[in-house]
Amino acid sequence: MENTNIVKATFDTETLEGQIKIFNAQTGGGQSFKNLPDGTIIEATAIAQYKQVSDTYGDAKEETVTTIFAADGSLYSAISKTVAEAASDLIDLVTRHKLETFKVKVVQGTSSKGNVFFSLQLSL
């Protein structure tokens, strides 16, 4: 099963286990970051990013979905440019240091225009 919409992951997406993780992320999605209180810390075992096409009011656009896999089996997902940028760097760091578990803090902010946005921090 070749999945060409995978952007990046902290695990091997070519193995059966990796493909199951991606399948679950794409079909289940998990809990949205929008439903998490600001400052929520997720005990994570993996992160993946993939592309999906969203159709909003007849305007199809490609977006990056970021999914965090928690140690308890839960999934947390977001479609957010700021999350995607932070997660991309986080995936590099986790992969480089071969971290098996790590704590991700979901940070909520408000732009000068009043829009809510999310980002990620690595928590110690």
From Swiss-Prot:
Entry's Pfam families? Phi29_Phage_SSB
Q: Does the keyword DNA-binding apply?
A: yes
Q: Which domain of life is it from?
A: Viruses
Q: Which GO terms describe its biological process?
A: DNA replication; viral DNA genome replication
**Record key words, sorted:** DNA replication, DNA-binding, Early protein, Viral DNA replication
Annotated GO molecular function terms are: DNA binding
* Xref: InterPro entries: Phi29_Phage_SSB
Q: Is DNA-binding set as a keyword in this record?
A: yes
State its role. Single-stranded DNA binding protein required for the elongation during viral DNA replication by strand displacement. Displaced viral DNA strands are transiently coated with the ssDNA-binding protein and therefore protected againt nucleases. The latter is then probably removed by the replisome that performs lagging strand synthesis or during the events that lead up to the recombination process. Has helix-destabilizing activity since it removes secondary structure from the ssDNA in replicative intermediates.
Concerning its family, UniProt says: Belongs to the phi29likevirus single-strand-binding protein family.
Q: How does it assemble?
A: Monomer.
Q: What is this protein called?
A: Single-stranded DNA-binding protein
Q: Which organism is it from?
A: Bacillus phage PZA
What is the phylogenetic placement of the source species in the record? Viruses, Duplodnaviria, Heunggongvirae, Uroviricota, Caudoviricetes
Gene name of the record: 5
